[in-house]
């Protein structure tokens, strides 16, 4: 009963989460082409963005069309590389802070009642929506490993989710610290992509910006592969194979490629209404799933909760 209810919600979330690929890639392209614009005059930013995103999404499609090896691509290769390069940048920044945290004044929006503005800003991380989408991939990978017992699958998903949550929390905390400390060096940036580029350039120069570009490349690559795979698998099952997994993967990759060329700031602005619409139901579904045992996962509870949001 529970599965029959959340399946459409997960499908919708997967579709919206696929748009997160383009948003994350906006960060990637902003960082990469900030670096390129300072060191090369032979490319315009628009052309460089087009060429780079084309190559990037070619890799995304290559890996997405081989979902059986996704644990190798992401778990054993891409994730460790991302964590290594990210750690190099963060350690360099923390060892020589630009300003003490206590000396940094909050922006006007966060001076009073900061919880709700921060919550809305947090929508942009796509974590809740991506969690719904990635859950499909995680369960599918576990089953391909020969695990078919639902209880064991649930335990594996819970443990992997808990570990992921801890790592993400750590990454967010150190990123916040580095960002706050950088206020002693730079004015408030238009977006996080610009801020990261400035921080990397300050502490490590051109090498730092190169490390940052590599770090964000791997971060976005693993996210994009997971999102495209989740979206393609979901819609393949929905259509009963009438439009193949391969076709859906190509479609979602092409869609993300097109959107990624709009630019980071524009993507963020366009995504806000969508996030405001989809995030409350996503949070409600996740919360109800955790407390569902207390009302027997009654379908009517889910329906009424979503109606009243």
Go through the PLM ranges and name each one.
Residues 81-93, 157-183, 253, 257:
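Selective recognition of specific alpha-helical transmembrane segments in multi-pass small-molecule
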Residues 66-77, 115, 138-167, 185-197, ...:
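Hydrophobic, small-residue-rich membrane helices and short re-entrant helix-turn-helix hairpins
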Residues 171-221, 273:
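TM-loop-TM module centered on a large, flexible mid-protein loop between adjacent transmembrane helices
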Residues 24-48, 143-144, 224-251:
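Helix-loop-helix connectors at the membrane interface of multi-pass transporters/channels
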Residues 2-15, 47-53, 113-121, 202-219, ...:
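Select transmembrane alpha-helical segments in multipass membrane proteins
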Residues 308-309:
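Conserved small/polar residues in nucleotide/adenosyl-binding loops
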Residues 57-78, 144-147, 257-269, 286-297:
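Membrane-water interface regions at transmembrane-helix termini and the short interhelical loops
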Residues 83-110, 128-129, 140, 177-180, ...:
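Hydrophobic alpha-helical segments and their helix-loop junctions in multi-pass secondary transporters
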């Amino acid at each position: 009963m529970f599965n029959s209810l959340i399946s459409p919600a997960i499908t919708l979330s997967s579709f919206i989460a696929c748009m997160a690929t383009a948003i994350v890639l906006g960060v990637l392209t902003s960082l990469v082409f900030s670096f390129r614009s300072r060191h090369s005059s032979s490319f315009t930013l628009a052309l460089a963005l087009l060429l780079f995103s084309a190559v990037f999404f070619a890799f995304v499609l290559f890996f997405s069309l081989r979902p059986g090896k996704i644990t190798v691509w992401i778990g054993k290769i891409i994730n460790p590389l991302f964590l290594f390069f990210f750690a190099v940048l963060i350690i360099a920044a923390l060892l020589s802070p630009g300003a003490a945290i206590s000396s940094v004044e909050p922006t006007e929006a966060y001076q009073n009642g900061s919880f709700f503005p921060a919550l809305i800003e947090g929508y942009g991380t796509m974590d809740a929506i991506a969690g719904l989408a990635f859950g499909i991939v995680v369960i599918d990978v576990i089953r391909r490993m020969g695990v078919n017992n639902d209880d064991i699958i649930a335990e594996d998903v819970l443990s992997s989710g808990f570990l992921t949550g801890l790592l993400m929390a750590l990454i967010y905390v150190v990123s916040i610290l580095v960002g706050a400390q950088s206020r002693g060096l730079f004015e408030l940036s238009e977006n996080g992509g610009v801020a990261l580029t400035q921080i990397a350039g300050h502490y490590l120069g051109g090498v730092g910006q190169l490390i940052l570009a590599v770090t964000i490349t791997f971060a976005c690559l693993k996210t994009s592969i997971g999102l495209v795979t989740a979206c393609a698998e979901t819609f393949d099952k929905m259509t009963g194979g009438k439009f193949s997994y391969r076709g859906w993967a190509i479609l979602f990759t092409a869609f993300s490629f097109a959107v990624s060329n709009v630019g980071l700031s524009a993507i963020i602005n366009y995504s806000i209404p969508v996030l405001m619409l989809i995030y409350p139901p996503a949070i409600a579904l996740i919360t109800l799933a955790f407390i569902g045992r207390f009302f027997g996962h009654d379908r009517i509870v889910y329906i009424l909760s979503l109606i009243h949001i």
